[in-house]
C-alpha cells in the first residue's frame, strides 16, 4: 500500500511505513506544479509610474481638479517587460460616497510610449494613438477630483502594460477595459494623490 501525502504544494508518495520511494521517482514527483500556482499566470511585474504634476502621496493641485482647469496630469513611466503591445490607464477614487468612482480611462496607448503630457484633450481618439474611455461623470477623457466637502479622498492612477492591442470600441467603460485586459496584464505601476474641498 502507498499513502498519499500533500505537503507544501508537492505530491509525495510514502510507503505505509513512511519510507521514501527511490530518489528518481521522488525527483519526478517534485516537478508537479504547486496547487497555488496551477491554472494561474505568473504575478505581473512592476513599472515605475511618475508625475511632475503633484507629489505622490501628497495633495493634488487645484489645476487638476474640478475647482480649476480640470486638466489631466503629466505622467511618465519606465520600460515595460518584453511582449508589451499597449498600455492602459485608470484613475479612480475609492473613497467616493457611492463606492469607487472612475475619473479616467485610457487604453491602447502604443507600446513605444513612455509618457503623456499634461492637459490632454477630451477626445476619444488620442493624437499619436490610443483611446480615452468614458468616466463616471459620463464624459470621455479625464475629469479630475471633485469630492463632496469634507475629508480628503485618495485618487489612484494605475498604469498597465498589456500583452495585446485591445481594439475596444470608442469610449469604452472601465468595466469593459477591466474585462478585456484581465488575462493580458504583464506589469503595472501606481500613483496616489489626495484632494479635499
Specify the residue positions occupied by each region the protein language model found.
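Bacterial N-terminal signal peptides
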Residues: 19-32
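N-terminus-centered regions that define maturation/targeting leaders and the start
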Residues: 35-197
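Hydrophobic alpha-helical segments, especially transmembrane helices
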Residues: 16-18, 104
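Residue-level recognition of conserved structural "scaffold" positions that shape functional pockets
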Residues: 14-16, 24, 64, 151
Amino acid at each position: 500500500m502507498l499513502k498519499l501525502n500533500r505537503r507544501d504544494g508537492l505530491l509525495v508518495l510514502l510507503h505505509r511505513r513512511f519510507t521514501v520511494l527511490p530518489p528518481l521517482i521522488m525527483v519526478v514527483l517534485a516537478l508537479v506544479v504547486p496547487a497555488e500556482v496551477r491554472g494561474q499566470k505568473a504575478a505581473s511585474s512592476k513599472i515605475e509610474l511618475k508625475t511632475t504634476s503633484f507629489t505622490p502621496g501628497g495633495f493634488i493641485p487645484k489645476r487638476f481638479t474640478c475647482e480649476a482647469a480640470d486638466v489631466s496630469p503629466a505622467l511618465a513611466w519606465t520600460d515595460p517587460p518584453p511582449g508589451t503591445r499597449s498600455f492602459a490607464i485608470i484613475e479612480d477614487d475609492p473613497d467616493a460616497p457611492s463606492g469607487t468612482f472612475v475619473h479616467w480611462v485610457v487604453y491602447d496607448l502604443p507600446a513605444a510610449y513612455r509618457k503623456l503630457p499634461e492637459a490632454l484633450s477630451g477626445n476619444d481618439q488620442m493624437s499619436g494613438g490610443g483611446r480615452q474611455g468614458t468616466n463616471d461623470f459620463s464624459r470621455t477623457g479625464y475629469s479630475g477630483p471633485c469630492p463632496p466637502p469634507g475629508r480628503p479622498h485618495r485618487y489612484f492612477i494605475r498604469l498597465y502594460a498589456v500583452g495585446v492591442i485591445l481594439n475596444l470600441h470608442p469610449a469604452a467603460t472601465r468595466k469593459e477595459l477591466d474585462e478585456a485586459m484581465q488575462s493580458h496584464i504583464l506589469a503595472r505601476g501606481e500613483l496616489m494623490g489626495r484632494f479635499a474641498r
